[in-house]
């Protein structure tokens, strides 16, 4: 796909091997380029506080992962961001020096990073694609954002709805591709914690093929708000624990 031109100004993807989600995003942005602006779409302070209250459950569930990741990526001039399902950044933590650079491109709480506001970017494009993805350097549609390398993964509710996005963003010259795996793993853990929080009011089933991994990030969780029966695939036994609040009961494999 050499010289893949997408905008009236002649802007084109720098890579001939751009991932399909990036190409689709550039095509969407090219058709709406006249509506994309470098100026951020930001909430007023009062509106941001109201949104933080609306998303208190996800913020509470994500806090351990945000703190852990922020400590891990601080030395790499990076930030950990939590955005809501519309793309508005709710929280940013990490390298204090990079926080100042990030502010220059409006990578801060209260600003919408929806794709129709900020062009191709990990938060907004992950929401549209409903999948974890990386947007590195010049893959960003807006040139001012091309200093960034961003890695975002959706956080899903027990019903599969997207509750928000966990993102690791940093200097494009220093970020590593494994940041996407970190973001994806932590987004799953946040989703599990949302279920556990709901489990204070109802039952949830924790399962894994190995009993020793029932408390790992790779475990599976099923939430039951009303009494019911859980069916398992034939020939696929697993170890399970039925939990409610702080109580647990082992189930036979």
Q: What does each model-identified segment do?
A:
Residues 138-142, 209:
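Short, solvent-exposed loop/turn elements at beta->coil junctions and helix N-caps
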Residues 123-124, 241-253:
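Terminal output helix/cap of sensory domains in signal transduction proteins
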Residues 94, 226-238:
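PAS/LOV sensory domain surfaces, especially short acidic/polar patches at coil-to-helix junctions
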Residues 217-221, 228-229, 239, 252:
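C-terminal catalytic or substrate-handling cores of phosphate/nucleotide-
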Residues 138-139, 147-152, 250-253:
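PAS-family sensory/regulatory modules and their coupling/dimerization elements
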Residues 1-116, 121-134, 147, 156-226:
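Intrinsically disordered, low-complexity terminal regulatory regions
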């Amino acid at each position: 796909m050499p010289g893949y031109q997408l905008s009236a100004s002649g802007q084109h993807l720098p890579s001939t091997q751009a991932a399909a989600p990036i190409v689709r995003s550039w095509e969407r942005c090219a058709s709406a380029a006249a509506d994309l602006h470098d100026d951020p779409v930001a909430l007023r302070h009062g509106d941001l506080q109201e949104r933080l209250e609306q998303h208190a459950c996800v913020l509470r569930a994500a806090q351990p992962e945000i703190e852990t990741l922020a400590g891990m990526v601080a030395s790499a001039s990076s930030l950990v961001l939590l955005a809501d399902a519309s793309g508005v950044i709710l929280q940013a933590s990490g390298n204090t020096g990079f926080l100042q650079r990030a502010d220059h491109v409006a990578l801060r709480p209260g600003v919408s990073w929806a794709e129709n506001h900020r062009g191709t970017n990990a938060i907004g494009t992950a929401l549209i694609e409903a999948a974890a993805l990386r947007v590195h350097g010049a893959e960003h549609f807006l040139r001012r954002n091309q200093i960034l390398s961003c890695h975002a993964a959706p956080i899903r509710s027990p019903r599969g709805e997207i509750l928000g996005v966990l993102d690791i963003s940093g200097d494009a010259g220093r970020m590593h591709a494994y940041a996407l795996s970190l973001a994806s793993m932590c987004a799953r853990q946040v989703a599990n914690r949302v279920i556990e929080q709901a489990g204070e009011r109802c039952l949830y089933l924790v399962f894994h093929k190995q009993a020793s991994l029932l408390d790992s990030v790779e475990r599976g969780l099923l939430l039951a708000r009303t009494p019911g029966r859980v069916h398992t695939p034939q020939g696929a036994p697993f170890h399970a624990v039925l939990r409610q609040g702080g109580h647990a009961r082992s189930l036979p494999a």
